[in-house]
């Protein structure tokens, strides 16, 4: 994936054609949201001419700037600067208007609020080439999990209300949301050991992705085929990759796992250099026993 605009500053598009020729399969400015609709329209129109996928972060930066939590009971009780769920809806509706104008292939990286879902559903019903994702954290945690300003739970967008979390689970189940992502965002210890408002957002998630997802399975929200469709097949299809499926001639990228294996999450056992997981100390189920990439075994769990 390559940047959509130079320096990801939202003002001038990158050399999308050259980057695509070099192997870029999608274009995004990640968390940075441009307020220059004309610049983004030009970038989308050019991406459309090349059949490229544009990935955006639906958010109104004017409303969300400086926020550390979602507006609601928790932020009010703790006195934390908060962002309204309307910021996500407004950002998404702007993006979808530009998609309608340009016809570009579009993916919303994180939908986390119930208020954004109607706009997404309308766009799909209208035949726009749009997909959307949400993170495993927004499917399994809510605003009150932050507790006493626990910075490992500070993510972007912030954790939402329980009503929003349940709405996201239902949206994955009915296909309104296509992709569940890890949104793996490492942060060093020093950037997390700060007052909540000053701490860096983000959480490591690659190693906790599967056991966290198993919470949805064990709670009866999603069966395994639906879960892995959203975690593997749908993102691979959207990116035009051959992975994410068990099929003849498909890459043998496989995992062997026990969905019921219980364990206590200890962040110091993570292989990642960063240890900022919100699941530290949590009782979890679902262990990866072995991993193959391209038919070669690259991991085996300790017995």
What does each of the following model-derived ranges do?
Residues 1-12:
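Metal-cofactor-binding active-site regions of metalloenzymes
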């Amino acid at each position: 994936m390559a940047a959509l605009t130079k320096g990801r500053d939202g003002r001038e598009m990158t050399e999308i054609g050259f980057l695509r020729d070099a192997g870029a399969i999608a274009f995004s400015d990640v968390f940075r949201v441009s307020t220059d609709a004309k610049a983004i329209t030009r970038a989308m129109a050019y991406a459309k001419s090349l059949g490229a996928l544009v990935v955006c972060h639906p958010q109104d930066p004017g409303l969300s700037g400086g926020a550390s939590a979602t507006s609601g009971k928790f932020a009010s009780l703790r006195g934390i600067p908060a962002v309204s769920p309307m910021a996500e809806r407004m950002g998404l509706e702007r993006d979808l208007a530009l998609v309608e104008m340009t016809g570009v292939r579009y993916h919303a990286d994180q939908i986390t609020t119930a208020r954004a879902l109607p706009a997404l559903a309308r766009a799909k019903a209208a035949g726009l080439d749009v997909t959307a994702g949400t993170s495993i954290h927004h499917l399994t945690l809510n605003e009150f999990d932050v507790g006493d300003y626990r910075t490992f739970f500070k993510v972007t967008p912030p954790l939402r209300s329980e009503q929003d979390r349940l709405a996201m689970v239902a949206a994955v189940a009915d296909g309104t949301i296509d992709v569940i992502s890890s949104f793996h965002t490492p942060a060093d210890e020093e950037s997390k050991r700060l007052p909540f408002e000053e701490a860096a957002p983000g959480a490591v998630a690659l190693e906790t992705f599967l056991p966290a997802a198993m919470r949805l399975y064990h709670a009866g929200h999603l069966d395994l085929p639906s879960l892995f469709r959203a975690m593997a097949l749908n993102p691979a299809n959207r990116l035009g990759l051959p992975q994410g499926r068990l099929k003849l001639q498909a890459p043998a990228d496989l995992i062997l796992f026990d969905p019921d294996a219980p364990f206590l999450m200890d962040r110091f056992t993570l292989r990642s250099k960063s240890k900022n997981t919100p699941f530290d100390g949590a009782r979890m189920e679902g262990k990866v026993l072995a991993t193959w990439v391209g038919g070669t075994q690259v991991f085996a769990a300790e017995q």
